[in-house]
């Protein structure tokens, strides 16, 4: 069972690293003192957890006294034990703290806190398998580094959802797209009672080059957005496509996207507001 200990300087990105591991399927616990690592390991085994990550830092004031013993005991029980230590230069840490207006856990002046924290955490840095300097890394870059570090693989599913704006956009979508600029079959008496799943309706929606160009740009944007989500460790990504009523244009676009983006593992195409309530 992979057991990852994440530590490092306050403001260096521990929360970002822990969230990346959580998105990749790890059970995470924040600010767990070393003397509880063994108990956490036992509980995880008992509950059948397959991946566990914990973080620890200088807020656990007496953690150094238990560090060596806790680490040695755990390493004897679990071969797949990893320790990740994050750091950054003091100037960057200061900027991050000033931006978030947070207080340092040691509670002194920031530059003094950084120096003291480096000293306190030096033993943990010494036993780390990997040290990452996050000075020049964005949160996304760090998350990608963490996932690559542990060679994490995960199933990714793209969910496509068509809807009508007059029924309100879905609240759980990661990306909401408006396709109301496409030709509207509602104004054709023959096509009005039909749906975007039917070939004649789709042909009407994409009847001119402007519509084809619009779709091509939208498709490429959805692909880029979904791939970015996948590469940063997300397990799923929901794209909602909206027209006025959710009967014609959004359905046609969602269905076409499902066919064109098959390689992204389209999990389900849900036509929320289509009269028949059809699901593909």
Swiss-Prot record:
Keywords: ATP-binding, GTP-binding, Nucleotide-binding. GO terms for molecular function: ATP binding; GTP binding. It comes from the Bacteria. GTP binds at residues 57-60. The keyword Nucleotide-binding applies. Transmembrane segments: none annotated. ATP binds at residues 8-15. Belongs to the RapZ-like family. Displays ATPase and GTPase activities. This is Nucleotide-binding protein Deide_09390. The lineage of its organism: Bacteria, Thermotogati, Deinococcota, Deinococci, Deinococcales.
């Amino acid at each position: 069972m992979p057991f990852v200990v994440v530590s490092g300087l306050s403001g260096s990105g521990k929360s970002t690293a822990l969230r990346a591991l959580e998105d990749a399927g790890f059970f995470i616990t924040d600010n767990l003192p070393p003397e509880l690592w063994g108990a956490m390991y036992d509980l995880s085994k008992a509950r059948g957890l397959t991946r566990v990550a914990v973080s620890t830092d200088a807020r656990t004031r007496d953690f150094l006294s238990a560090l060596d013993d806790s680490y040695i005991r755990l390493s004897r029980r679990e071969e797949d034990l990893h320790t990740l230590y994050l750091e950054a230069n003091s100037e960057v840490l200061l900027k991050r703290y000033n931006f978030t207006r947070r207080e340092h856990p040691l509670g002194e002046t920031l530059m003094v806190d950084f120096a003291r924290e480096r000293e306190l955490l030096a033993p943990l840095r010494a036993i780390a398998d990997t040290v990452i300097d996050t000075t020049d890394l964005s949160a996304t870059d760090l998350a990608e580094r963490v996932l690559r570090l542990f060679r994490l693989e995960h199933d990714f599913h793209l969910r496509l959802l068509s809807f009508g704006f007059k029924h309100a956009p879905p609240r759980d979508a990661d990306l909401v797209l408006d396709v109301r600029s496409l030709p509207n079959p509602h104004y054709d008496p023959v096509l009005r009672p039909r749906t975007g799943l039917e070939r004649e309706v789709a042909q009407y929606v994409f009847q001119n080059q402007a519509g084809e160009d619009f779709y091509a740009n939208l498709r490429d944007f959805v692909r880029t957005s979904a791939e970015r989500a996948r590469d940063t460790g997300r397990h799923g990504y929901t794209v909602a496509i909206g027209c006025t009523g959710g009967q014609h244009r959004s359905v046609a676009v969602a269905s076409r996207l499902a066919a064109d983006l098959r390689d992204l593992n389209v999990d389900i195409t849900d036509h929320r507001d289509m009269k028949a309530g059809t699901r593909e």
